[in-house]
Swiss-Prot record:
EC number: 2.8.4.3
Positions that bind [4Fe-4S] cluster 2: 157, 161, 164
Gene3D superfamilies from the UniProt entry: Methylthiotransferase, N-terminal domain, tm_1862 like domain
InterPro entries referenced in this protein's UniProt entry, alphabetically: Elp3/MiaA/NifB-like_rSAM, Methylthiotransferase, Methylthiotransferase_CS, Methylthiotransferase_N, Methylthiotransferase_N_sf, MiaB_methiolase, rSAM, rSAM_horseshoe
Name used for this protein in its record: tRNA-2-methylthio-N(6)-dimethylallyladenosine synthase
Binding, [4Fe-4S] cluster 1: 12, 49, 83
Job description of the protein: Catalyzes the methylthiolation of N6-(dimethylallyl)adenosine (i(6)A), leading to the formation of 2-methylthio-N6-(dimethylallyl)adenosine (ms(2)i(6)A) at position 37 in tRNAs that read codons beginning with uridine.
Signal sequence interval, chain numbering: none
Cofactor note: Binds 2 [4Fe-4S] clusters. One cluster is coordinated with 3 cysteines and an exchangeable S-adenosyl-L-methionine.
The gene coding this protein: miaB
Amino acid sequence: MTKKLHIKTWGCQMNEYDSSKMADLLDATHGYQLTDVAEEADVLLLNTCSIREKAQEKVFHQLGRWRLLKEKNPDLIIGVGGCVASQEGEHIRQRAHYVDIIFGPQTSHRLPEMINSVRGDRSPVVDISFPEIEKFDRLPEPRAEGPTAFVSIMEGCNKYCTYCVVPYTRGEEVSRPSDDILFEIAQLAAQGVREVNLLGQNVNAWRGENYDGTTGTFADLLRLVAAIDGIDRIRFTTSHPIEFTDDIIEVYRDTPELVSFLHLPVQSGSDRVLNLMGRTHTALEYKAIIRKLRAARPDIQISSDFIVGFPGETTDDFEKTMKLIADVNFDMSYSFIFSARPGTPAADMVDDVPEEEKKQRLYILQERINQQAMAWSRRMLGTTQRILVEGTSRKNIMELSGRTENNRVVNFEGTPEMIGKFVDVEITDVYPNSLRGKVVRTEDEMGLRVAETPESVIARTRKENELGVGFYQP
């Protein structure tokens, strides 16, 4: 009888990536097959996130539901992982004694051993340690699920922003060696992946070891990824302004595989608030990066993160944030009301901004961003955009859906053989969360991948000088 695994995931793209790797790992070691139905599962895993307010209570609420399943099936294994587990492991054990496994973001690769241990002596297992590189050494073989894929290149963060739990829950920065990253991406490309999204809590701080023992830079890595046959688009998430060096900007100038869209969190437009947040950069320095980026790639669009109502934020501070939003002309944002995360320095600050004021500021900020995003979308009306077709549309299963380079979802009429390929689409309609278009050119008509024989290359490139001596001219 097939054993089944159910994973519930909350939070960031890194958590989504971790969950997919857990599923692949437990399939390889124990033969567990994923199921969307918790009642069918032999193992239940909750991959948690501590960024949102009341994250801990959300975890216990979910565990309470699963407790009922365990009462019906005592052999059921329940595991809690992710950032809440790392932060609140002992509390979870005390309050939810029926949980069998508690693991942190850096120990998910040890799940097979943990499950074996629980199956053996029924004793609970808690492992929320921070082994430096071991997790990367034990990743399962990559498995493509469509034309796009996430690839983790580093973990953790050394920035210690005063509001953020990441350094405490995921540890300090650890970079994967470049060879491991490139091999994983090459394997994915061989399975039909056309776009990769490089992941890290502070991805542009990557400093991985190269094959010759030297330390590479993120700019080096981007160029190496772009050289992999089959990879046509590169994205990365999430960056820190302080690590956004000029050599990365130069990659935007000369590497077309790197998309014209960047998510670069700023959090506030007030230098005073940025200092309280421990961001180590000013609003002017942030704008200087954007100015250089647009000089290198004029059509690039920028999204960002904002926290409103941070302790001590005045009306003037908020107005400076709104000015920055207008100056940069952000295309999109993830914006939140400040809520203290236990164990962070900001949790000890006086939360002196009234709740209603926070809500009002968030509304104003989001309305402005939405207006700017719609203006960007309207500029695309009537233009031809290259779409990577990801699958059927969520709105209409008789239509296809894909993304533009600037991360817009486009729905259009097409045929199944277009999935996984590029099409050029004329944008005909603009909506708040998507675009609509009609196909004007398929990938077969683009000449993107023209197979050539060695003889044809020689015939095309062979030249002779005036003495009749042959040479090659690429």
